[in-house]
């Protein structure tokens, strides 16, 4: 199950008491038709649970029992498109939800009573996300939450509504509409709080923390590996110089203090400078070991 589906299923588990959730769904997924008996309203979704949710809201708030139809885009079951079809009280619904424009169409922007009221705003954002919202999988590390709108002014109003909740929302135009989006992990988690998807918010944070911890461990391992590689490279240079000294003037030609360091270096190529210092009979600092190794290398270079 995708993270987007998890969020939507959590939202569908809540009882919807604010009609502005339905307002957003109709605004973003609804279309008006005209027949002999008057206006009709069709609300489409590819999610059967969302279709049932829309049915329940219409039944609760307007005492309607709309028809649910479906057709298939392909032969695959998952490609069903569900339509909640309403023929009664359409004008009442549009007026009550403040959706109708002056030309008996659906108003494209967001009504001020929604923008100016926090509870209405939260409900509207819930409906908007249920309708066209998606969240990129949090373990991808490329965080993004998007809500698609057919109309640019609606996308901009959505961004302004999100900004009222201190979210850094942005809008980008597409060929067939516009997208309101969030790209910061903290904004996405806060958005999930706003729409009351607390379980999804906690799951998002947990996945984010696990990923960041894994990345920190990998970075630490990479640094350690690089340090070991540098140590071994420097170690092999010194060992080759010690062999050169042994083959030319002989190991005993080195002063005893240099011989001690040389013996530990040859015996333990992977030792760090500190480990060499700790292995000597006479205690020595790291700088003291480095000084002796430089002297060994200098002797070899002069041969």
UniProtKB/Swiss-Prot annotation:
Gene Ontology biological-process entries: cell division; regulation of sporulation
Transmembrane residue ranges: none
Keywords: Cell cycle, Cell division, DNA-binding
DNA-binding region: 272-303
Pfam families reported for this sequence: HTH_WhiA (PF02650), LAGLIDADG_WhiA (PF14527), WhiA_N (PF10298)
GO MF annotation list: DNA binding
Family to which this protein belongs: Belongs to the WhiA family.
PANTHER family linked: CELL DIVISION PROTEIN WHIA-RELATED
Function: Involved in cell division and chromosome segregation.
HAMAP family (alphabetical): HTH_type_WhiA
Protein name: Probable cell division protein WhiA
């Amino acid at each position: 199950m995708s993270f987007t589906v998890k969020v939507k299923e959590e939202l569908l588990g809540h009882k919807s008491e604010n009609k502005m959730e339905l307002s957003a769904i109709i605004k973003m997924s609804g279309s008006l038709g005209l027949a002999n008996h008057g206006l009709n309203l069709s609300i489409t979704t590819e999610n059967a649970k969302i279709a049932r949710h829309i049915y329940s809201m219409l039944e609760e708030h307007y005492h309607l029992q709309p028809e649910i139809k479906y057709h298939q885009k392909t032969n695959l079951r998952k490609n069903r498109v569900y339509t909640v079809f309403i023929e009664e009280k359409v004008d009442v619904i549009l007026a009550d939800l403040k959706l109708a424009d002056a030309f008996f169409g659906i108003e494209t922007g967001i009504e001020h009573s929604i923008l100016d009221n926090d509870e209405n705003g939260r409900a509207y954002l819930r409906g908007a996300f249920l309708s066209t919202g998606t969240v990129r999988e949090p373990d991808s590390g490329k965080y993004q939450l998007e809500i698609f709108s057919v109309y640019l002014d609606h996308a901009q109003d959505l961004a302004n509504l999100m900004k009222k909740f201190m979210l850094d929302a942005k809008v980008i135009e597409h060929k067939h509409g516009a997208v309101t989006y969030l790209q910061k992990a903290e904004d996405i988690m806060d958005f999930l709080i706003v729409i009351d998807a607390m379980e999804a918010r906690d799951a998002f944070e947990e996945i984010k923390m696990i990923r960041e911890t894994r990345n920190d461990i990998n970075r630490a391992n990479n640094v350690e590996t690089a340090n070991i590689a540098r140590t071994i490279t420097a170690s092999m240079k010194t060992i080759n110089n010690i062999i050169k000294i042994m083959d030319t003037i002989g190991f005993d030609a080195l002063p005893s203090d240099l011989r001690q360091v040389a013996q530990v270096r040859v015996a333990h190529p992977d030792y760090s400078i500190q480990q060499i210092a700790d292995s000597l009979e006479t205690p020595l600092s790291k700088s003291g070991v480095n000084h002796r190794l430089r002297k060994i290398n200098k002797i070899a270079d002069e041969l």
